[in-house]
Amino acid sequence: ILGVARAESLGKRNRIVTSLIEHKAILEPCNWLHERGFDVVYLPVDEHGVVVLDAAREVIDEKTLLVSIQLANNETGVLQPIKQIAEFAHEHGAWLHTDAAQAVGKISVDVSDLDVDLLSISAHKFYGPKGIGALYINRAIQGSRIMPLTYGGGQEKGIRPGTLNVPGIVGLGMACELAENVLVEEGIEINRLRNFLEECLEKKIAGLRINGKNVLRLPNTSSLFFPDVDADVMLLNMPNLMLGTGSAC
């Protein structure tokens, strides 16, 4: 995000479009750009946690430089309509970036089908080593300028100088390979277990709300709302369960 924005340097296109539910890895760079003169627009989501397409269509225009929308939300697991948003972006000559950190390793991710220009992943999200990630850059825009954030050697086509982390790169590649080998089989089983858990809870707890239940979600994520219950107090009374009150990461 910062590299694309720095290359434009407040030229004709100075609008960045993102959503209100992004990870801080997206929101904080966007806030930083806003403080330096960029027009940053935050898209709302509907009651299911899905980005409102009509809002996206309305704000993406000829001034838009980049649209950055996550592929899957890290709290609800809800999948976002990346393909449609990419279409809006490309109609106006803007680039589409998606943060796919939560999705890769859980569902099939096809950059050609999504029609994204930029896609970022992080290895530790799918049992790879910590401290290594990857950025996919569509071949169609590889000749365009993305400014580096640091300077030094010419590694990684000059975008990220520095000695390559070979063990991390190998680990990321192997983690991708292993995840791909079991993606469908494990996805079906985890989805079955998730649904079974939610069905049991719904039968026993009146007023329970499952966030994103009626839209496409990651199979491994369940976001639950318990009415009239303090979530932190509830967790303290269930020390043997791995639960969180916020981001799944």
Model-derived regions: residue spans:
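Pyridoxal 5′-phosphate
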Residues: 1-249
